[in-house]
């Protein structure tokens, strides 16, 4: 048989030219080796003659081993389709019976060949006795006239070689299976009891039934053949009345159910912890051990079934520490937690000093990267930057790049590489926050010859991580620079060709790649869209980003917004949009937790609000927003009056809320800083700031002319223009007076306590202080006092000053006063000792008066 071919060899005895009783007996003493090729020597197969049966000595049996395949079994081997089913068939041979006893796990097939070579299939079900292997061996060996021991040995050897994978077929064909009959003494079922064989190797927990063909009974599933050594510890399972695999009844069905439960329990040992973990992640408040108990009691091995059971029975036992959240809960997951951010090794404030080993490796790597720098300078910079490789290399790279840009050329021609010499230097500079490191570092005369190199696997984990981080960041920075250069070249090409496109908002000219568009293809630059979205989302609180073209009613597609807007603006836009959509659909049912502002939907008739936020889980009253455990059995007013401090706090909260107007449509709080009293919410609703009613336009306000601040004499409508501070103060005073009057009525005048902030004492009047005298500079030399002002005895005609007719007694007109310099202690504003002039006269006073000597 060729190597690699696992097909079984079938021996047809009718093909021998001579009678089976002549030449066969002559050569039965020696083994026969059957091989497909003379060049290849396979495993020898011993062919021994079967023991002759007493009923019919003309028919022999050929024993074929069954294939291990579980998908194809129970087939029918049809050697001749024209054979009738009603013909008589001989019984099994004693050789077959002996082999069944020796090898109970081996499922064999018996094909009975007649003299004409036709197959006689068995049509009647045969009874199989529940007999142990020892009894069968004893009975077989006690039969006189037959060499039982030799037959058994030959049978064992034959089946062992046939079970070898060398003789197994690659594509086994479906074959017919028959039960073997051992002519032995029948025992009662009560004595032996039904026994079922169980494999040692793992099998499916729920075996599928075997289809029956041609009404031939057989076992429920095929039993693979094994060597005899593996079968010594196995039990022999023989059914007394073989029948179809399904259905079973009586004790057989009970034993089979027990076997299934036992195997299913083994499989579910790993499934139960997983089910408990996933269920507790979805129901974090369930009591510990309750889920596992439900799984065992109700046999719920499906996550959906467990969740439905807990949802349908909300009164399940809850854990006492309800605020403790399961760490794997999906409610705690977010986009930031999904992927932990990596350490930014370029941020000096987040770095911690490394140990000496990392410092040495980082210094060796830097000395190999910068061979023209001194090792002392490299170690100094590395020490100043806490021994981190990435940030130190970036600082050196920036300094070298700046030196390459600013260093002068030695000649007029541009060189590809600058020459370095001992007089060259770089200015190492690192600035980040309050940290500033500077040092001038000179280049070496020659490059460093000896450097220590490290294999990537030999680096310490911290140094390896920083090296990978630096390479990744440098790659990203290079790609970004290339992208910016490409955009610049693209814009220059657009400008050269005159193909720049105008923005419909700022009317600037941009290339097409820097523009975005609305659904109607109106083009806008990205900067205009970013500013428009930022103002709409953060300023107006709107989520509707309509087109900025005046006549267009379209909006910007979400794909365009995701490409243009930054992440912060985009997330806020989605948040606003979700809030408006939920508020529009469930305006009356949307409730927010007073502690964490977590939104949830609650029926209008439900008063208790349980916060679904796993970090909060507080139960509060929907109306007064007080804790439900203190509110149970009391109304909101009774709860407020029960505690004086809480009552006062509630009144003060009302006074604080008086400054805030809430939209009647979406409940958004509004505060007026300036403008008219017509308030517009982001949801589109309009309300009056004074009376807080819903309005539409300006018809609600007074339309008559009147003086500012004076009431209208013709109508009682609200004023369009008022001071918001005065309106809020009036409303707060009204709430305060009502609360104080109610407190006096209940507790009396003696126990009255003021509600609200204490009264502010009027500011004390400060006596008016006259203007301080003009400070006189303290000169080094004392200034001589001016002469007394004396009027001349008679008027003199005015003399126009000319360059050569100045009067002798008249000095130059002084310049205006200049304050002294802050850093100069001496003002040098000295008066002339021999020219008595009045320095304090204003400039428009005219010429100085004359003095008599």
UniProtKB/Swiss-Prot annotation:
Assigned EC number: 2.3.2.27
Q: Name the SMART domains for this protein.
A: IBR
Q: Which residues bind Zn(2+) 4?
A: 663, 666, 681, 683
What Gene3D superfamilies does this protein map onto? 1.20.120.1750, Zinc/RING finger domain, C3HC4 (zinc finger) (3.30.40.10)
Binding annotation for Zn(2+) 1 = 503, 506, 525, 528
Instruction: Relay the activity regulation note.
Output: Allosterically activated by 'Lys-63'-linked di-ubiquitin.
The IBR-type zinc finger ranges are 571-636
Q: What's the protein called, per UniProt?
A: E3 ubiquitin-protein ligase RNF216
């Amino acid at each position: 048989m060729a190597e690699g071919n696992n097909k079984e060899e079938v021996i047809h005895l009718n093909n021998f030219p001579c009678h089976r009783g002549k030449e066969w007996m002559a050569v039965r003493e020696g083994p026969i080796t059957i091989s497909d090729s003379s060049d290849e020597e396979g495993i020898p197969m011993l062919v021994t003659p079967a023991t002759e049966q007493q009923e019919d000595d003309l028919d022999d049996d050929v024993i074929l081993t069954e294939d291990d395949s579980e998908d194809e079994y129970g087939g029918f081997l049809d050697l001749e389709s024209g054979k009738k089913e009603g013909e008589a068939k001989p019984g099994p041979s004693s050789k077959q019976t002996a082999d069944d006893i020796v090898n109970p796990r081996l499922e064999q097939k018996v094909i009975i060949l007649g003299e004409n070579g036709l197959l006689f299939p068995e049509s009647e079900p045969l009874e199989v006795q529940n007999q142990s292997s020892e009894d069968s061996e004893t009975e077989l060996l006690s039969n006189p006239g037959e060499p039982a021991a030799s037959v058994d040995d030959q049978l064992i050897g034959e089946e062992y070689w046939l079970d070898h994978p060398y003789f197994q077929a690659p594509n086994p064909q479906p074959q017919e299976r028959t039960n073997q009959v051992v002519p032995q003494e029948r025992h009662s079922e009560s004595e032996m009891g039904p026994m079922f064989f169980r494999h040692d190797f793992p099998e499916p927990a729920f075996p599928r039934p075997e289809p029956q063909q041609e009404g031939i009974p057989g076992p429920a599933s095929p039993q693979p053949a094994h060597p005899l050594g593996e079968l010594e510890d196995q039990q022999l399972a023989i059914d007394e009345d073989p029948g179809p695999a399904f259905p079973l009844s009586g004790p057989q069905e009970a034993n089979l159910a027990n076997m299934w439960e036992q195997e299913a329990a083994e499989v579910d040992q790993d499934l139960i912890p997983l089910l408990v973990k996933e269920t507790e992640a979805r129901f974090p408040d369930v009591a510990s051990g309750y889920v596992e108990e439900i799984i065992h009691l109700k046999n719920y091995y499906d996550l959906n079934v467990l969740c439905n059971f807990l949802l349908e029975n909300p009164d399940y036992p809850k854990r006492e520490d309800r605020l403790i959240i399961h760490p794997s809960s999906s409610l705690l997951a977010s986009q930031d937690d999904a992927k932990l951010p990596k350490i930014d090794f370029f941020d000096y404030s987040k770095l911690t000093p490394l140990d000496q080993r990392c410092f040495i490796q980082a210094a060796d790597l830097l000395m190999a990267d910068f061979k023209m720098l001194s090792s002392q300078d490299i170690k100094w910079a590395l020490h100043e930057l806490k021994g981190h490789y990435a940030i130190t290399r970036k600082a050196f790279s920036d300094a070298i790049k700046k030196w390459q840009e600013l260093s002068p050329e030695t000649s007029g021609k541009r060189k590809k590489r600058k020459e370095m010499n001992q007089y060259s230097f770089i200015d190492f500079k690192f600035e980040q926050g309050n940290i500033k490191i500077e040092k001038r570092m000179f280049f070496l005369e020659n490059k460093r010859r000896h450097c220590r190199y490290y294999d990537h696997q030999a680096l310490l984990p911290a140094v390896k991580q920083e090296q990978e981080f630096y390479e990744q960041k440098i790659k990203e920075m290079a790609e970004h620079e290339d992208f910016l250069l490409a955009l610049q070249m693209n814009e220059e090409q657009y400008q050269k060709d005159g193909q720049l496109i105008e923005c419909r908002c700022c009317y600037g000219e941009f290339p097409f790649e820097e523009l975005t568009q609305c659904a109607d293809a109106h083009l806008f630059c990205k900067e205009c869209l970013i500013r428009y979205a930022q103002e709409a989302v953060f300023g107006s609180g709107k989520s509707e980003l309509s087109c900025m073209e005046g006549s267009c009613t379209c909006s910007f597609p979400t794909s365009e917004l995701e490409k243009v807007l930054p992440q912060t603006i985009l997330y806020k836009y989605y948040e606003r949009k979700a809030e408006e959509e939920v508020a529009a659909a469930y305006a009356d049912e949307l409730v927010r937790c007073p502690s964490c502002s977590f939104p949830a939907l609650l029926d209008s008739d439900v008063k208790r609000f349980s916060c679904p936020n796993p970090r909060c889980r507080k139960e509060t009253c929907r109306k007064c927003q007080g804790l439900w455990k203190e509110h149970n059995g009391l109304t909101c007013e009774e709860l407020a009056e029960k505690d004086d401090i809480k009552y006062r706090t509630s009144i003060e909260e009302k006074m604080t809320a008086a400054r805030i107007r809430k939209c009647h449509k979406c409940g958004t709080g509004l505060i007026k800083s300036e403008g008219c009293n017509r308030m517009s919410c982001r949801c589109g609703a309009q309300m009056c700031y004074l009376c807080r009613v819903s309005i539409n336009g300006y018809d609600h306000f007074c339309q008559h002319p009147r003086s500012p601040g004076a009431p209208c004499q013709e109508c009682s409508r609200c004023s369009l223009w008022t001071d918001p501070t005065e309106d809020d103060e009036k409303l707060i005073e009204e709430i305060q007076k009502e609360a104080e009057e109610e407190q006096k009525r209940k507790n009396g005048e003696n126990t009255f306590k003021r509600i609200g902030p204490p009264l502010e004492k009027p500011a004390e009047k400060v006596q008016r202080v006259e203007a301080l005298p003009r400070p006189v500079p303290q000169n080094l030399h004392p200034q001589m006092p001016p002469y007394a002002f004396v009027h001349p005895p008679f008027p003199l005609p005015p003399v126009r000053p000319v360059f050569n007719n100045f009067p002798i007694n008249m000095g130059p007109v002084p310049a205006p006063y200049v304050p002294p310099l802050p850093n100069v202690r001496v003002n040098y504003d000295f008066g002339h000792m021999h020219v008595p002039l009045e320095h304090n006269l204003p400039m428009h006073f005219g010429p100085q008066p004359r003095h008599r000597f």
